[in-house]
């Protein structure tokens, strides 16, 4: 009889192993239809609980084998025991298939076979896993099952704490919605509908059956209370609402509060087990509107637009600063050009408003005079050699001598020393050279004062400013304007119109003076070029005269 019953139970076991994934896929499909997210990993605590019950039941059966050999029981009772042990073909047609059973419903098949013997002990609450446990093995068999369950239940509180720490903070809201759809109350207990049979186990040896008989799970301290009528628990193996006879209840996601110690499956840390809700028990939290979804793309676009605007504002500010600095640099460059291009060092201020310190020093200009023999048309060289002729005036000018003038003066001194030893025929050339040098020195000495006098004459001939006609009571204004200096007291006595006229007149004078300055600079460059050419010619003539003098000096002793 033992082998036949095992063969009969083998087919439901295979169906459970193969149908586990079918049930999971069916549950996922139903959840998708009802817009409920389900995480298969959240079922691990209950699955582990079912596995612990299965192992305990198998060990209990192994312990009952020697007892059955000592006191054999009728075939019908043994058949009822094994048929009531595990029921693997119990499936739910409701919207929420029960994963937590893992194919186990203690006493589901035995309920129909032993319903005729439910007259003697209908109100019994003892832990009786099957009908034969009481009749064949005495109360010690029930204690053996309890001890086996204690062995397998000891590590579960540790696993329970770990699962609570990992899953309770993350899946608080989602698990609450899911549990509420499956019929859970606010305290974590599954609700029972009218007509629902949640826990069925076998009665005593007379065949009596209790409709509300359950198997208690261990308390947090590990002790069992099998005779506690208030502790309606089934070792975590609870069948929730949704049997074939029950109508399908539509589900809706409801957010509800859950104690911090509770976890998935309705287990409470205070009680340590699963409880069943009476038909009229349980209150529901009113439905709350879900939080609006975040539009991340629009948010990113908005942030990018803000960054782009900020960058544009920075670029505009930088462009303004650059334009302001460029204007300042342009004005400064114009002033430097005007200062470097001043015609007279100590002339009047009508040609330039800068000091004469901006002009390059004379030694720096004379330093590039050696390049004149290579290219005397160079403007930079000609500008720096403007005062080369002044070096020849040793008596009236304080400027240092240029290299070329030093050479010419050294040649003249050497000629004067050799003049005594030369013949009278050579005196004509040397005398002529000295005479030309003296005339050049006199002309250079008179050039600077004559230039100053010419500038004064041009200043007197310059037309008066039209401001003098507008301000007859202030005749000194025109003179102050010519000198580029106005007193604050004079400006306070003027009206806005008069000040605007003065400003316009100053702008017009600046433009005219700039044009005149450009013309004078061009003339100066031409004169510098001519001067450089004349200096080169003088240098060549001096060398030629020296060579001729040496040649004639060599011929004289030969004669």
UniProtKB/Swiss-Prot annotation:
Q: Where is the composition biased (Acidic residues)?
A: 167-181, 416-426
Q: Where does it live in the cell?
A: Cell projection, Axon; Cytoplasm
Coiled-coil boundaries: 496-530
Q: Which GO terms describe its cellular component?
A: axon initial segment; cytoplasm; node of Ranvier
Signal peptide (UniProt feature, chain positions)? none
Q: Where is the composition biased (Basic and acidic residues)?
A: 182-195, 225-234, 381-395
Where is each IQ domain found? 47-67
Q: Which GO terms describe its molecular function?
A: ankyrin binding; calmodulin binding; transmembrane transporter binding
**What are the boundaries of the region Disordered?**
64-141, 161-295, 312-332, 380-426
| Required for interaction with ankyrins: region residues | 415-559
* Key words, A-Z: Cell projection, Coiled coil, Cytoplasm
Q: List residues traversing the bilayer.
A: none
Effect of loss of the gene:
Mice lacking all isoforms encoded by both Schip1 and Iqcj-Schip1 are fertile and survive as long as wild-type mice. However, they exhibit mild growth delay associated with ataxia and reduced pain sensitivity. They display decreased thickness of the piriform cortex and partial agenesis of the anterior comissure which could be due to impaired axon elongation and guidance. The morphology of nodes of Ranvier is affected but nerves do not exhibit significant electrophysiological characteristic differences.
Its biological purpose:
May play a role in action potential conduction in myelinated cells through the organization of molecular complexes at nodes of Ranvier and axon initial segments. May also play a role in axon outgrowth and guidance.
What do we know about how this protein assembles, alone or with others? Homooligomer (via coiled coil domain). Interacts (via IQ domain) with calmodulin; the interaction is direct and lost in presence of calcium. Interacts with ANK3 (via ANK repeats); required for its localization at axon initial segments (AIS) and nodes of Ranvier. Interacts with SPTBN4. Interacts with KCNQ2 and KCNQ3.
**In its UniProt entry, what is this protein called?**
IQCJ-SCHIP1 readthrough transcript protein
* Annotated organism of origin: Mus musculus
